[in-house]
A protein has these predicted regions:
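Feature for intrinsically disordered/low-complexity regulatory segments and propeptides
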Residues: 1-88, 92
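Intrinsic disorder/low-complexity polar-acidic segments
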Residues: 83, 87-226
């Protein structure tokens, strides 16, 4: 199994691949950006052939710190910087946001960050959901945000979190990114409200008592529906 991790940080529990910087407490966005090795920007550069002629309609996404080419994209591609991903998550969750993991995959082509959401109690069990933000800088994928119980520590767990999430939002890197991010905030805030309501309903059902006669009626009705 390949982790594809370039840089990352994690809180306490070491990932299976053993890579990354361990911290003892979940970090705020400013510290998480640095500890995850994500404190760099993506710059767009023109592309030229050997003779010096410019290739029209395409740009190269280049990492600011080392000049690494992350990918070739169309000139319609809108960059979402790593720091903007953290700002989005800070604003969405609000309060004292804390990050559990974050990092760079595939030599900077993909990044993720995982923030802890407020703990909930559902029928006596504590549930600790995360908000996962994933972004690609090589033009291969969309901006994706989801709610997940999965602790993301590598490319495989990121794919698992995104592919199994029941509540998520995604958009391509074109058009008005600011408007799309506002749409994401509204969508995910509704999903968060849904989780709160789900916890209330589950507790209500758990505390509802029914008689043997009522249970028998429910069973008979269920059998009739299957016939």
């Amino acid at each position: 199994m390949v982790a594809n991790v370039e840089t990352m940080f994690y809180v306490r529990e070491k990932p299976w691949h053993g890579l990354g910087v361990e911290v003892q407490e979940a970090l705020n966005s400013a510290d998480a950006l640095k500890m995850a090795g994500l404190d760099w920007e993506v710059k767009q550069r023109n592309i030229q052939v050997c003779g010096g002629a410019k290739i029209e309609n395409y740009k190269a996404n280049v990492r600011s710190t080392d000049g690494r080419v992350l990918g070739v994209v169309s000139d319609r591609y809108q960059i979402v910087q790593n720091k903007d991903a953290f700002s989005f998550t800070d604003e969405l969750i609000g309060g004292d946001v804390r990050y559990e993991t974050a990092g760079s995959l595939q030599n900077g082509k993909k990044i993720w960050l995982l923030a802890k959401m407020p703990e909930r109690e559902v029928v006596g069990d504590k549930v600790e959901p995360y908000l996962c933000f994933s972004n690609t800088h090589d033009g291969s994928g969309s901006i994706r945000v989801c709610m997940t119980p999965i602790r993301v520590v590598c490319n495989n767990t990121l794919n698992l979190a995104l592919n199994s999430a029941k509540r998520q939002w995604a958009t391509k890197h074109v058009g008005n990114i600011d408007e799309k991010m506002q749409e994401a905030r509204m969508c995910l805030q509704l999903a968060d409200a849904y989780m709160d309501e789900l916890a209330v309903c589950a507790d209500r059902l758990a505390n509802t008592t029914i008689t043997d006669e009522q249970l028998d009626k429910i069973g008979r009705a269920s059998c009739r529906e299957r016939v």
